[in-house]
Amino acid sequence: MWELLAFLLLAIAYFFRPKVKCPGAKYPKSLPYLPLVGSLPFLPRHGHPHVNFFKLQKKYGPIYSLRMGTKTTVMVGHYQLAKEVLIKKGKEFSGRPQVATLNILSDNQKGVAFADHGAPWQLHRKLVRAAFALFKDGNQKLEKIICHETSLLCDLLATQNGQTIDLSSPLFLAVTNVICWICFNSSYMKGDPALETMQNYHKGILETLEKDNVVDIFPALKIFPNKSLEKMRHCVNIRNELLSKIFEKHKENFNSDSITSMLDLLIQAKKNSDNNNTGPDQDSKLLSDKHILATIGDIFGAGVETTTSVVKWIVAFLLHDPQLKKKIQEEIDQNVGFSRTPTLSDRNRLLLLEATIREVLRIRPVAPMLIPHKALVDSSIGEFAVDDGTNVIINLWALHHNEKEWHQPDRFMPERFLDPTGSQLISPSLSYLPFGAGPRSCIGELLARQELFLFTAWLLQRFNLEVPDDGQLPSLEGHPTAVFLIDSFKVKINVRQAWREAQAEGST
């Protein structure tokens, strides 16, 4: 009996052994692993994954591999190797893994965030870039849209003067409406049931992504009931139902002479493809309603929670450092004053503010670990071979917290992005990729940077954001999902006296 069991275990171990394509090649050093379960028993059970993987670099080096179940994953934690993956060999590593959770979220590899490399992903990414180009100039200029929503946000917060509030909901409304103007050329009013629906499904998706879904590591388990997958399906169905209603209205009212939103542009591309007006490269199957909904869903998923979260991180760090907040406000007062509101042209003058935003993106990156990439061909990273189909994860936390690249990396020091005189922004290290890079870089980076600057500048010009009367400071620990979220906290809103006096003068 024992002999038979031993034989079966050996047979399983042999069957699931790593298949090395090039026996003579040098592969990254690997964590220990067992048949079927891979390296899971050898991974730390407590703490944030990005921190744990960073700590493993002390033993295994800046590039190492592990097995998630039977699948090999390479972890990259040095900027030179990361840039090789993302830029130099960006096309070779531009694939995406196919796992159950993300397949549901992307409606089976549709959209621009989680779709594998191929014609659909290339086409939709190209169209999204074209859509952002609609907002370069004129009345639809991106800056005007952001300033409009920021103004409404400030007006809303002014009604809360002297009160202690959670910024999450008002920020979510403002950031969501920026995305709505881009995608639909419309916006939501405070209290709209659709907005609450959107906020709830966003929260549900992030909660699902936060959990370690065993089915993503062991796909065979898909045949069994799974609460996480069911929750993801439920949230995605709600999202698609909401977006489908908007989509249908846009199709009914579509006017090819008035392309004012991303959805208009996608509908136009579909009509052109259906009419064979754009050549053989645009197959109408790639522009099905499901493909379009997935792309719009990705823009919302990537554009709303990310910016909302980073603004809250900025406020949290300023609450911990009131002297820095005061210096930024003095900078705004001197360079902008109160007779007008901040614009993007002020970025060259509000250097401490810009440095603070950059430092927040360093110390609390939007995604501590980038969405996994996949090797499309047999390739290499540095001196190490990487086989076709291998998953590759860039540990952004490791890049941004490398002691050899950053002085006291765990300290919040915006001044590191300024020269000694404080009169010029600098790049203190090449180990800084807050929005990724290469073919899979964040497609909304320009939008995000503009939002972060304008939201923060307007808020600090108009308000004193203060610690509540109970003295409760926000936790800076956070918890990573697809986005590095900050735990909810409250802030006391006070309209600045100087702003109030300036407005009173202007009205007389």
Curated annotation (Swiss-Prot):
Q: Regulation of activity: what does the record state?
A: Regulated predominantly by intracellular cAMP levels. The 17,20-lyase activity is stimulated by cytochrome b5, which acts as an allosteric effector increasing the Vmax of the lyase activity.
Q: What is its EC number?
A: 1.14.14.19, 1.14.14.32
Its required cofactor(s), as named, are: heme
- InterPro entries xref list: Cyt_P450 (IPR001128), Cyt_P450_CS (IPR017972), Cyt_P450_E_grp-I (IPR002401), Cyt_P450_sf (IPR036396)
**What are the protein's UniProt keywords?**
Endoplasmic reticulum, Heme, Iron, Lipid metabolism, Lyase, Membrane, Metal-binding, Microsome, Monooxygenase, Oxidoreductase, Steroidogenesis
Q: Could you tell me which pathway this protein works in?
A: Steroid hormone biosynthesis; Steroid biosynthesis; glucocorticoid biosynthesis
User: Reaction catalysed by this chain?
Assistant: a C21-steroid + reduced [NADPH--hemoprotein reductase] + O2 = a 17alpha-hydroxy-C21-steroid + oxidized [NADPH--hemoprotein reductase] + H2O + H(+); progesterone + reduced [NADPH--hemoprotein reductase] + O2 = 17alpha-hydroxyprogesterone + oxidized [NADPH--hemoprotein reductase] + H2O + H(+); pregnenolone + reduced [NADPH--hemoprotein reductase] + O2 = 17alpha-hydroxypregnenolone + oxidized [NADPH--hemoprotein reductase] + H2O + H(+); 17alpha-hydroxyprogesterone + reduced [NADPH--hemoprotein reductase] + O2 = androst-4-ene-3,17-dione + acetate + oxidized [NADPH--hemoprotein reductase] + H2O + 2 H(+)
PANTHER family, alphabetized: STEROID 17-ALPHA-HYDROXYLASE/17,20 LYASE (PTHR24289), STEROID 17-ALPHA-HYDROXYLASE_17,20 LYASE (PTHR24289:SF13)
What family does this belong to?
Belongs to the cytochrome P450 family.
Q: What is this protein called?
A: Steroid 17-alpha-hydroxylase/17,20 lyase
Q: Which organism is it from?
A: Equus caballus
Q: Gene name?
A: CYP17A1
